[in-house]
Amino acid sequence: MNKPVFFRRPFKYTYFNATLILVVINVVVFFLTYFNRNLQYSLSLNVYYVLNYKMFWQFFTYMFVHGGFTHLFFNMFGLLIFGIAVERVIGSKEFLLFYLLCGVISGAFSFVVYLLTGSARVVLMGASGAIYSVLFAYAVCYPNSRVFIWGFLPIRSPVLVMIYTIIEIVEQLFTYSNVAHLTHLFGFVAAFLYFIIRMGINPIKVWKNVLHKDNPNREQSNDNEDL
């Protein structure tokens, strides 16, 4: 797998499979909190707890807590599929920083919205915000890649991000569920800011270049990876 030519890395490149380490940590925390609900509440992000009990560590720990096996499975599946590919491009240290920081930022942004809208009893848990950031990063690292939806429908990775953005906005505005659509959107926002500020890359320009040059007759670039 070749890295995109436009990429620069602030950290010296290292690789030690940080993605797998994150998966293991998530699984361990899941079983610890599954049998100890008090621990689950202490680690999940709760506006009320943060404001009244100063439990600021929740901005970090919430992304390792999951409410059920299905929640855990799909998040870890997404992390493995997209995380390994991104980590190979930016290196393990950068990937860890990216994943953890984006998870904190997406949770913090959600916290502010919940606070301003009077939703102090909302409990936020799960790696979804960070996973959406990883999906965004995949679309930047592999803009020519096609992701196969339902196993047969190929969609360019940048287009997939756009589709998910629309879906999450619609779900947030017009439906009611216990899914943190707002945090998913903030995961995209956090990743966008990370690439702009930390990596010096404008994802919009990257995607525009790819989509404008998208011609079935042209030679494909060396950053293709189909999933």
Predicted feature descriptions by range:
Residues M1-N17, I21-V27, K93, I167-L227:
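C-terminal transmembrane module of polytopic alpha-helical membrane proteins
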Residues F7, T14, A18-I21, Y34, ...:
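Transmembrane helix-loop-helix
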Residues A18-N26, Y99-C102, S157-L160, Y164:
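Hydrophobic alpha-helical transmembrane segments of polytopic
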Residues N26, F30, S106-G107, V161, ...:
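Helical transmembrane-bundle signal
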Residues V27-Y41:
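Alpha-helical transmembrane segments of multi-pass membrane proteins
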Residues L39-F64:
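Extracytosolic (periplasmic/ER-lumenal) interhelical loops and adjacent juxtamembrane/interface segments
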Residues R88-V89, C141-L153, M199-W207:
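Alpha-helical transmembrane bundle and helix-membrane interface signal
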Residues L135-E168:
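Multi-pass alpha-helical transmembrane bundles in non-GPCR membrane proteins
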